[in-house]
């Protein structure tokens, strides 16, 4: 019999062993964990027991994997040649093993602390360089969520550029992908922008148009030269966006040369599995003059204090965490890990390898055309890349035979059943072979009662198939990084070199407040590599995706049970998109009950910047609510605001526990006040890790809540994505959840598509399924309890050294605590950034700095860290306090000290000349245990201002930059 206690997953997920829990509880003055939790979570919302009857009993790792495998087998693996933005591709094994499956890459956080993030910053810099080379535009960001979202961001940017005019029309090519059009319509409606879908051959642009979106190649496969149309649009100051296929762009002239303003697309074809629609890294490239309007992260080059080249996130003043309701976008989490994979895919293949893949696709498509003509099929003689559409009476039989032979073809018209099909389309991809072509041709010939004789075209010239637009004529991707690593040995070492320059959970605790950097267990991640999940196209017939249907339905039910809500949508593929979706649901409900004028959204001043940015995107006007000395919403100010805006009140956005790290005792009264005046309560689930199994937002008054599966439910952060931000809603809002059908909807009340895939980032949902399945109700409650216990232990231990800024009246915090360093700055000049950089020398990633209050550190240990690691962090902070005291007492110089000069690199401490008033050991090994396990910052402190003044977002080579 298996030893179930020894194999209990929660024992491996939870960091505090029983003896440590007892020691902490004694230090905090509590008899047991239940007594402690009762002192933290308000009694009126605390559940006595987790919702056992609605959640499964915990399974161990082996049992959970077996159960999930049985679910995965409900999906049917076939070769999908459907296209429409999703294609078969091969992730080189060296990239799968050393990046995709490597916790050094997938457990790191967004690279805000750049000195210990040079590896992933370089990988993302390579991605940006790849995109600028593909598009011919000078600025590219470090990824967006998907192609549909990228198109919506391009529309918003185009409107922002032309906001002073009366233009409100956005022209969309009728060849645009259906999911992109669906996302555009959703985004345009609350902003009162007009979307007009047209055949571009008939288009006449005038002063009412602010932007234009072209799809090249179009969904039917056509390629054409848009130069004259671009020139026409520019006559009326309209911005032109082109959605491009990156493999097609390998061969055709860069769009920047044709005059486009913005180029977008998906990098999925560059080694990222289809995964039922996501996650995939979109790209966004733009002309120089619009660089300060670019959405998402932007990696730029700067210099460190030694004058060495260094990378960091550039132009951050554009972003929502600073600009709030005036931000260029609400995008926070993007798709960093997938962009990293795409960049390594380009490094692996190099320019010539990518060209050969693209040429083979064209060859197969051209051969298919020749054979189909011989069989008697007819089609327009257009210039095409990978796709061929055929309309014929035999379509239903062709689809039936294709499926029997293991192929999915695109059903025409889109959204039709096989029985009502009027045609088919074939989209070739990297995995396509002549063998597959011949199998398909045999089907097409048999249906027409024709003979098929395979033959090879030895005289094929791809240029003859691309005659309708200019081709790429000059060498590209000449940078060393895309040409140096032709052997696996060299590529493996390059990947490892970059990984070693990054701090991740492999190296130590990442105590970022509001980020929940908990364990991402290997067993949770293993299933996402299974073909049954990774190879399924999002538009396959529903009977081929029953596994995804079963998994998503089960996961939605569990999330409803844990939150106390009645319905869940898994479609939003980031927390920011969950916010947007939730607010649109509220807005749709108000419209449905004839109260469309309710457009005021109340938001506490402590809220995360995505909240006001999302509210504006959803068509709301933001009104701020004050906070009190304990970090709670100022109830008197809330009452004043709801009464002032009673007839216009649409929603209150509130984070719980608050962004100040406390459980607000009157949360029910807050919700009641909003409801009394006709509003709805949107609860930001960023801090749900303090609630799971303890209390349920739907039970204490919230109407909508988004959940960050990449925080609370163990999807790794990946250095800045992927993420999933599903929304859970109360019963009266269920009908308004996002539509899953991009072609037609049976539910007219549903808001439109939020992401470019019906199930969002579907392929990583198994991670959260595994976490819940292995933890069970009791394990989840224990996780929340220990996360809160660890945070209170840190607050209690560090309180004599640093002021804990916000506490409940009984001295307790929630799952995170905020240390106030502002008085230290006034006395010594030492800033919070100095402490953050000094923590790198101690072997830690810094907590969240200067948010939600400037000059503070917000610490969240999570439930996964051990007592030893938590104590090591506390020891580091206490040691740093002693270094500050030495400055305050005059023992240490105000400017020449370990904090001001942190972080200390290996180059610095091994230099022949050491002219600092502290020892090399104090600089690099301030804790005794570091001699055996030292993480070195890759660069000295980076000059952020220099990087923004001299913006460089792509380059010839990093090596060449280091010489300049």
UniProtKB/Swiss-Prot annotation:
Signal peptide residues on this chain, from the entry's feature table: none
Catalytic reaction(s) noted = N(6)-[(R)-lipoyl]-L-lysyl-[glycine-cleavage complex H protein] + glycine + H(+) = N(6)-[(R)-S(8)-aminomethyldihydrolipoyl]-L-lysyl-[glycine-cleavage complex H protein] + CO2
Q: Which UniProt keywords apply?
A: Oxidoreductase, Pyridoxal phosphate
Q: Which Pfam families match?
A: GcvP2_C (PF21478), GDC-P (PF02347)
- What is the required cofactor set for this protein? pyridoxal 5'-phosphate
Does the UniProt entry include the keyword Ligase?
Answer: no
One Gene Ontology BP term is: glycine decarboxylation via glycine cleavage system
Kindly state the subunit structure of this protein.
The glycine cleavage system is composed of four proteins: P, T, L and H.
Its protein name is Glycine dehydrogenase (decarboxylating)
- Origin species: Prochlorococcus marinus (strain SARG / CCMP1375 / SS120)
Q: Source organism lineage?
A: Bacteria, Bacillati, Cyanobacteriota, Cyanophyceae, Synechococcales
Write the gene name. gcvP
